[in-house]
């Protein structure tokens, strides 16, 4: 029975392992996070599409593109000069407004014209993830807070679609998020001390 489960979900399990590797390396500011994330995203494109989570499926294409962007951005910086940045409250207002407006409009579109499962929730986590991924590439500390909200909602979304290994992955993400935030906060504080 367990063997059958692994056989039927092998692609998802490989994607999960690569995604864990991605986030673990990102917490350590290791540039190898990006190729692991790219490969995981390619696999997840097919997984999400077959689960009827079309926004999540196409989000994976964005992740691949952002993976290459993040990889190129991080190549410009050595580990000794890894700089963590922060956004103003106004930028967060714009980002959150952007997510909410696009979530509603694309959720409405998906609800009206496709057989998408949970289109509004799918749209919200997709647009939120787009902003959060951009924030990771720009090394903004608040990315971890955005990911906490997105991943918490995603767990429920994936459970509802029977993607249990992926829901488990996002549970692991929730734990790693705390370590990532703490690690990046130390770097931000160190950067601020150097500037002062």
Mark where each language-model region is.
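Solvent-exposed, amphipathic alpha-helical segments
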Residues: 41, 45, 155-158
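Membrane-water interface of transmembrane alpha-helices
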Residues: 61-77
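Membrane-interface helix-loop junction between the first two transmembrane segments
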Residues: 25-39
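Polytopic alpha-helical membrane-helix bundles and their juxtamembrane interface segments
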Residues: 1-28, 77-78, 86-145, 149-196
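Helix-loop junctions on the outward
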Residues: 28-32, 44-62
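Hydrophobic alpha-helical membrane segments of integral membrane proteins
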Residues: 35-39, 55-58, 145-149, 167-169
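Mid-membrane cores of alpha-helical transmembrane segments in multi-pass membrane proteins
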Residues: 38-43, 63-67, 98-102
């Amino acid at each position: 029975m367990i063997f059958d489960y692994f056989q039927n979900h092998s692609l998802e399990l490989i994607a999960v392992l690569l995604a864990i590797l991605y986030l673990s390396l990102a917490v350590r500011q290791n540039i190898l996070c990006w190729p692991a994330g790219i490969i995981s995203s390619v696999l997840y494109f097919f997984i999400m599409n077959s689960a009827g989570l079309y926004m999540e499926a196409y989000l994976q294409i964005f992740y691949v593109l952002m993976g290459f962007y993040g990889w190129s951005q991080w190549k410009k910086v050595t580990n000794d000069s890894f700089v963590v940045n922060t956004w103003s409250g106004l930028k967060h207002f714009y980002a959150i407004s952007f997510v909410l407006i696009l979530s509603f409009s694309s959720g409405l579109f998906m609800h009206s014209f496709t057989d998408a499962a949970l289109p509004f929730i799918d749209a919200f986590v997709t647009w939120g993830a787009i902003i959060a991924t951009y924030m990771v590439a720009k090394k903004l500390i608040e990315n971890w807070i955005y990911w906490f909200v997105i991943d918490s909602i995603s767990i429920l979304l994936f459970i509802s679609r029977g993607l249990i290994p992926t829901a488990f992955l996002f549970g692991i993400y929730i734990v790693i998020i705390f370590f990532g935030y703490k690690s990046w906060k130390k770097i931000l504080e160190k950067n601020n001390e150097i500037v002062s």
